């Protein structure tokens, strides 16, 4: 069959849309890259001889025919009879976004980048003289729909359409049958975007609007453009680097004009979504592409961009900065990157199809402006190590904190306020050794000096805050003690102030006098840590029992709670003993022996001190949440034991024992009982014990100051230490009984059970020696 017969439509069959059309008139209508068409009609007039193009571009024609055969675009006999000129590649790729009729929107919404298999163009093979000639021919001769010639389907089942009617859109990010990604949404064409950017929407087929002669890319104005962004357009890029999965494209005319100023840029792959230029929301603008510098035509909203080369655009250091983006609400946002930026005063719209790189920035500075929209001086809030632009960045959450109150902005600049450790109110200073407010300071002083017996109406776990701190004085007082408030801390503070004042007075002396004296003032010797000061530091804190006061009291439950509290206090006493200066120099067996013999002495003496300081010796203050009142004393087995312990608290109250005296006496009670055979390091033990006896004498002198009364007080205090033996022995006897008598069902903690089990044989055999100050 004659090949011309194949090109004629069958009789009686209407023209099939989507098929290439040929007639006997001069010229051929050619369709190339069927999967990459945007509704563009291309006509090759007879004045352009195909034989010449075929001779000069034989290698290009063969390469192009292979591509058509691979993609199923060749028709039966079409490749042999209709040779393809070289200008097809240039028109298909380069003018796909610009060509069309002058009275019709040329860009359809389904323009798509073909994949690598669909484009077979090598660098250096583009002829721009043919391209300009084809543009001139297209302007002179445009195809009308009624002049198109129809043919039926070819034997290969391939259909083509050369009509100028737009194709159905797939939407942005969609794909057609050839898996190519569309550039624009279906409700937007190229000229709509160019009109938004301020570019004239006239048809690029106009001779005055030739894209290759556009003054925007003149050599003179290349300096006014942002040089990295000038080459960001894929139509003006060099051919050294393109994105992975695509071949290079070289447009020599464009690169000659920008060769001195343009740098290489990575072209995004076809399957990556194209970033939107800008997104206008309620009263602010989101910049989605770093290559867009836009000046709005309405209102006080504006943006100015300063850019310099980044890793994508050359070897320069990355620096992107967008300053002064203000909104009608008065907010201002500031994005700042490295300092090596090039300011640009000529704000021209630059359309960049390349999406931003994966890492362009290293920091993010955000500032807020208040007042008027035009004259707001932003302050910087730095967020280091945070990327500004990324692939598909849409600026989420910018408006979440856009309107800070004046109080918030003022307080954020200064240090955070200090809070009271008791009620979490704003602290007024350090009172009684703890950072508290004035209200808790006064409350604690009155509670201690007034000797109030506070009881919690709940479960000793009331919430103490700024609003509810007056609801429960017992829990508030317990929290004060837990925080570490102590009336003795006030005296220590006064001592420190006296030392500082004496040091300041010495420093203010005349230079002549200070030169003759030693460089170390006399007050420095008082700053040397003493044994008393060290004992103050290592003193254990007050522990809580966790006793539930809401449940009716029983002897079994109350004693079990006291034993559990005693076990924890023994653990605390072991840590305290190891921190005593000189105690760890003893043999390890001696340390364990002294603790096993003296644990009850330490517990009772500390209980008497707490009862004396908190209740003036009227009731037993085991813990802030466990106080033995008169009602609890009348329980079985409680009356006699509590009366013995109250005697110790009463003696302390009558003698008005100071804190320094209490600390020294407590260490002496640790060393008041030893085995009959003595200790392994007995000499060292005697030396340490005598050292703390002398410290007790120093504490007495420090308190009294009169030598005639010092010995009397020393006698009274040592008599109190001797009386502790009788009280401790009676309590130990009852403790051993309750431990051995399982019918009482009194619980003991593990550590306390171990100590009692080891101590019972020693006491029963009488293998102990009391170290008394006075003979009976």
UniProtKB/Swiss-Prot annotation:
* Tissue expression per record: Expressed in liver with relative abundance.
**Chain positions covered by the region annotation Modulating:** 1-419
Q: Could you confirm whether the keyword Ubl conjugation appears in this record?
A: no
Show the segment(s) annotated as Disordered.
1-25, 47-86, 394-415
Q: Where in the cell is it found?
A: Cytoplasm; Nucleus; Mitochondrion; Cytoplasm, Cytoskeleton, Spindle
Q: Which GO terms describe its biological process?
A: cellular response to glucocorticoid stimulus; cellular response to steroid hormone stimulus; chromatin organization; nuclear receptor-mediated steroid hormone signaling pathway; positive regulation of transcription by RNA polymerase II; regulation of transcription by RNA polymerase II
* DNA-binding region(s) in UniProt: 420-485
UniProt feature, compositional bias: Low complexity: 403-413
GO MF, one example: nuclear glucocorticoid receptor activity
Q: Where is the composition biased (Polar residues)?
A: 47-83
Stretches assigned to the NR LBD domain: 523-757
- A Pfam family hit: GCR
The entry's keywords: Chromatin regulator, Cytoplasm, Cytoskeleton, DNA-binding, Lipid-binding, Metal-binding, Mitochondrion, Nucleus, Receptor, Steroid-binding, Transcription, Transcription regulation, Zinc, Zinc-finger
- Can you tell which superkingdom this protein's organism belongs to? Eukaryota
User: Which residue stretches are annotated zinc finger (NR C4-type)?
Assistant: 420-440, 456-480
- Gene Ontology cellular component annotations, sorted alphabetically: centrosome; chromatin; cytoplasm; mitochondrion; nuclear speck; nucleus; spindle
The record's function comment reads: Receptor for glucocorticoids (GC). Has a dual mode of action: as a transcription factor that binds to glucocorticoid response elements (GRE), both for nuclear and mitochondrial DNA, and as a modulator of other transcription factors. Affects inflammatory responses, cellular proliferation and differentiation in target tissues. Involved in chromatin remodeling. Plays a role in rapid mRNA degradation by binding to the 5' UTR of target mRNAs and interacting with PNRC2 in a ligand-dependent manner which recruits the RNA helicase UPF1 and the mRNA-decapping enzyme DCP1A, leading to RNA decay.
Instruction: Share the domain note from the entry.
Output: Composed of three domains: a modulating N-terminal domain, a DNA-binding domain and a C-terminal ligand-binding domain. The ligand-binding domain is required for correct chromosome segregation during mitosis although ligand binding is not required.
Assembly and binders: Heteromultimeric cytoplasmic complex with HSP90. Upon ligand binding the complex undergoes a conformation change and moves to the nucleus, where it dissociates. Binds to DNA as a homodimer, and as heterodimer with NR3C2. Interaction with numerous other transcription factors modulates transcription activation.
Q: Which family does it belong to?
A: Belongs to the nuclear hormone receptor family. NR3 subfamily.
Q: What is this protein called?
A: Glucocorticoid receptor
Organism of derivation: Xenopus laevis (African clawed frog)
């Amino acid at each position: 069959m004659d090949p011309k017969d194949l090109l004629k439509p069958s009789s009686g069959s209407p023209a099939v849309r989507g098929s290439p059309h040929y007639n006997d008139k001069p010229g051929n209508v050619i369709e190339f890259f069927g999967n990459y068409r945007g509704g563009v009609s291309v006509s090759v007039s007879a004045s352009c001889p195909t034989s010449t193009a075929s001779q000069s571009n034989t290698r290009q024609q063969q390469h192009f025919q292979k591509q058509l055969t691979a993609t199923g675009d060749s028709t039966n006999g079409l490749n042999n009879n209709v040779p393809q000129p070289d200008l097809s590649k240039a028109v298909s790729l380069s003018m796909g976004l610009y060509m069309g009729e002058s009275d019709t929107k040329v860009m359809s919404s389904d323009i798509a980048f073909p994949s690598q298999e669909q484009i077979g163009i090598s660098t250096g093979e583009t002829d721009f003289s043919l391209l300009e000639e084809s543009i001139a021919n297209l302007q002179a001769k445009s195809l009308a729909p009624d002049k198109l010639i129809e043919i039926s389907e070819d034997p290969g089942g391939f259909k083509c359409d050369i009509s100028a009617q737009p194709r159905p859109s797939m939407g942005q990010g969609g794909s057609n049958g050839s898996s190519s990604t569309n550039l624009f949404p279906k409700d937007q064409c190229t000229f709509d975007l160019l009109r938004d950017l301020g570019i004239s929407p006239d048809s690029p087929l106009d001779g005055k609007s030739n894209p290759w002669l556009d003054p925007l890319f003149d050599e003179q104005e290349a300096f006014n453009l942002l040089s990295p962004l000038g080459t960001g357009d894929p139509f003006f890029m060099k051919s050294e680097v393109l994105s992975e999965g695509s071949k290079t494209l070289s447009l020599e005319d464009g690169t000659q004009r920008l060769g001195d100023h343009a740098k290489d840029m990575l072209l995004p792959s076809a399957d990556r979504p194209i970033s939107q230029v800008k997104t206008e929301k309620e009263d602010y603008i989101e910049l989605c592409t770093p290559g867009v510098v836009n000046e709005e035509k309405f209102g006080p909203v504006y943006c100015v961009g300063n850019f310099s080369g980044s890793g994508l655009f050359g070897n320069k250091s990355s620096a992107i900065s967008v300053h002064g983006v203000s909104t009608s609400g008065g907010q201002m946002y500031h994005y700042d990157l490295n300092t090596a930026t090039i300011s640009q005063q000529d704000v021209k719209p630059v359309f960049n199809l390349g999406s931003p790189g994966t890492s362009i920035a290293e920091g993010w500075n955000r500032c807020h402006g208040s007042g008027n929209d035009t004259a707001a001086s932003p302050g910087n809030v730095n967020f280091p190590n945070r990327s500004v632009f990324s692939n598909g960045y849409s600026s989420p959450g910018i408006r979440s904190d856009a309107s800070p109150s004046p109080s918030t902005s003022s307080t954020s600049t200064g240090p955070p306020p200090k809070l009271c450790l008791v009620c979490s109110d704003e602290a007024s200073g350090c009172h009684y050794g703890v950072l508290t407010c004035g209200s808790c300071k006064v409350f604690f002083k009155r509670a201690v000096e007034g000797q109030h017996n506070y009881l919690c109406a709940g479960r000793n776990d009331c919430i103490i805050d700024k609003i509810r701190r007056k609801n429960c004085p017992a829990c508030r007082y317990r929290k004060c003690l837990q925080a570490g408030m102590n009336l003795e801390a006030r005296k220590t503070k006064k001592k420190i102030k006296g030392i500082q004042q004496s040091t300041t007075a010495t420093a203010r002396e005349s230079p002549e006098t200070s030169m003759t004296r030693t460089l170390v003032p006399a007050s420095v010797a008082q700053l040397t840590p003493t044994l008393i000061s060290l004992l103050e530091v290592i003193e254990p804190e007050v522990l809580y029992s966790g006793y539930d006061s809401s449940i009716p009291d029983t002897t079994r439950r109350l004693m079990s709670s006291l034993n559990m509290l005693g076990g924890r206090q023994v653990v605390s006493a072991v840590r305290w003993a190891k921190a005593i200066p000189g105690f760890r120099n003893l043999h390890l067996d001696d340390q364990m022996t002294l603790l096993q013999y003296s644990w009850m002495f330490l517990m009772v003496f500390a209980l008497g001190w707490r009862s004396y300081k908190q209740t003036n010796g009227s009731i037993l203050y085991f813990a802030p949440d466990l106080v033995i009142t008169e009602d609890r004393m009348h329980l079985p087995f409680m009356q006699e034991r509590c009366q013995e312990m109250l005697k110790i608290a009463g003696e302390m109250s009558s003698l008005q024992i100071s804190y320094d005296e209490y600390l020294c006496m407590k260490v002496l009670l640790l060393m008041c009982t030893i085995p009959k055979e003595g200790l392994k390091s007995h000499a060292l033990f005697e030396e340490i014990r005598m050292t703390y006896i002398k410290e007790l004498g120093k504490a007495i002198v420090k308190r009294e100051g009169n030598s005639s009364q010092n010995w009397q007080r020393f006698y009274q205090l040592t008599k109190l230490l001797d009386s502790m033996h009788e009280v401790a022995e009676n309590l130990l006897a009852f403790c051993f009984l309750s431990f051995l008598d399982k019918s009482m069902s009194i619980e003991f903690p593990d550590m306390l059970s171990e100590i009692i089990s080891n101590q019972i044989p020693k006491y029963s055999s009488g293998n102990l020696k009391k170290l008394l100050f006075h003979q009976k």
